[in-house]
A protein has these predicted regions:
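Aromatic sugar-binding surface patches on proteins
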Residues: 101-107, 223-231
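Beta-strand signatures of extracellular beta-sandwich domains
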Residues: 80-84, 205-209, 245
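Extracytoplasmic/periplasmic copper-protein system
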Residues: 36-42, 132-162, 256-261
Length: 261
């Protein structure tokens, strides 16, 4: 028995081990508030749905739909969906921003993929932060590059927007927006490596307005397929004006509009 001051101090091995374990656990636990994405929670409202072919025949136009069946209310909604494919020459596949007026956090489009791999989709909830899911996609090679020496034609025009259903008060309505616009990454493949041969040409942003209110914005990359076509949702009332503004990476701008009925 040892003494500390005038009181006996008994060293218990079991108690000491327990303290060591608690200290080790605290040392490796991440600090709260880092903002890192975590695996999607088990509840249905925070489950990211990814629809992409396991094997895509055309690497220049891989169809992809990402969505979260989540409330879209002013105090609780999905702010964004971010798509990446880390193994690709152009890894960022798009960031899609939503508001409560979007009605549904969902987007469908076509992307380029150079070699496929593990697709990562990160969602951000206004109340619960970021969460993610992963899904494997396989593609034929060559979607992110053009043969060396090939001159890619560059042109854009003919924007369009159309509704996929009649407007019902308070419900999210599917919308298709498209633009005739060529695109390329500016990359060529030489000796097994991707090399930037010229500046890319692509649609880099599509912004959705109801009247003068911005309700969604889609930030695109050189991985967007030629002649982009996007499907998304809006929550609106009959009689409002819907506008979609496309802007490419050279600042050229196109606009399509439709009165909702």
């Amino acid at each position: 028995m040892e003494f500390m001051g005038n009181r006996p101090f008994i060293c218990c091995r079991r108690h000491a081990l327990r303290l060591l374990l608690l200290a080790a656990t605290a040392a490796v636990r991440p600090a709260a508030g880092w903002g890192q994405a975590r695996p999607a929670p088990a509840d249905a409202t925070h489950r990211i749905q990814v629809d992409v072919p396991l094997l895509a025949d055309d690497p220049v136009a891989v169809p992809l739909t990402v969505s979260v069946d989540h409330p879209m209310e002013p105090e609780h909604y999905v702010r964004s969906l971010e798509v990446t494919l880390a193994t690709d020459p152009v890894p960022k596949k798009g960031t899609f921003l939503f508001t409560a007026r979007s009605g549904r956090a969902s987007v469908a489009y076509q992307m380029r993929s150079g070699q496929g791999g593990e697709l990562t989709v990160v969602a951000e909830c206004s109340r619960h932060g970021r969460f993610e899911t992963k899904q494997t996609v396989r593609v034929a090679p060559g979607g992110c590059a053009v043969p060396a020496g090939t001159a890619a034609r560059e042109r854009g025009g003919s924007p369009s927007v159309r509704l996929d259903a009649r407007v019902k008060p308070g419900e999210a309505v599917p919308v298709w927006a498209s633009l005739k616009h060529t695109s390329h990454t500016g990359l060529v493949e030489k000796k097994g490596a991707f090399v930037r041969e010229r500046e890319p040409y692509f649609v880099e942003r599509a912004t959705v307005f109801l009247g003068d209110e911005r309700v969604s914005e889609f930030l695109l990359t050189p991985a967007i397929s030629p002649d982009p076509k996007l499907r998304f949702f809006v929550r609106t009332e009959a009689g409002q004006g819907l506008r979609v503004v496309f802007v490419n990476n050279r600042g050229e701008r196109w606009e399509a509009s439709q009165r909702l009925t």
